[in-house]
Amino acid sequence: MPTINQLVRKPRKRVTKKVKAPALRFSLNVLKGKLTRGKGSPFKRGVCTQVRTMTPKKPNSALRKIARVRLSNGMEVTAYIPGEGHNLQEHSVVLIRGGRVKDLPGVRYHIVRGTLDAQGVANRKQGRSKYGTKKASAVPAKKK
């Protein structure tokens, strides 16, 4: 337990919370070419610079699809491509949101399916909103 005198000399430090998706916090001032930190945004637009696969951490085994994305604020991040199959390639314009992938180190963002160049997952019936899939239209009735 510190004495009052010790606390006067060196006060207690505030515990700072680590930001989970830092790239969403910055915006680029194009005229000055400077990054400014603000309130942040829920999504950011970016261009894929590389689309590849990555293997997960120890107990799991798979080839997870990821993309390296250069954001509109100039930062480059690694984002996960959710769902089965995708149409993304280099120079595809995508929208990213925060959200890490637990078994992929360094992947802190998800690509939003069904927006910009990222198509929704084909033939998906349940949990469609997370994968950008439109509702399948009802089978038309036969005419007599």
Curated annotation (Swiss-Prot):
Job description of the protein: With S4 and S5 plays an important role in translational accuracy. Interacts with and stabilizes bases of the 16S rRNA that are involved in tRNA selection in the A site and with the mRNA backbone. Located at the interface of the 30S and 50S subunits, it traverses the body of the 30S subunit contacting proteins on the other side and probably holding the rRNA structure together. The combined cluster of proteins S8, S12 and S17 appears to hold together the shoulder and platform of the 30S subunit.
Organism from which the protein derives: Roseiflexus castenholzii (strain DSM 13941 / HLO8)
Chain positions with 3-methylthioaspartic acid modification: 103
Gene that this polypeptide is encoded by: rpsL
Pfam families: Ribosom_S12_S23
Protein name: Small ribosomal subunit protein uS12
Domain of life: Bacteria
Disordered as annotated region, ranges: 121-144
Complex formation: Part of the 30S ribosomal subunit. Contacts proteins S8 and S17. May interact with IF1 in the 30S initiation complex.
Molecular function terms, GO-annotated: rRNA binding; structural constituent of ribosome; tRNA binding
Recorded GO CC terms: small ribosomal subunit
Record has Cytoplasm as a keyword: no
Protein's UniProt keywords contain tRNA-binding: yes
InterPro entries given in the database record: NA-bd_OB-fold (IPR012340), Ribosomal_uS12 (IPR006032), Ribosomal_uS12_bac (IPR005679)
Keywords for this protein: Methylation, Ribonucleoprotein, Ribosomal protein, RNA-binding, rRNA-binding, tRNA-binding
Family in the record: Belongs to the universal ribosomal protein uS12 family.
Entry's Gene Ontology BP terms: translation
Transmembrane intervals: none
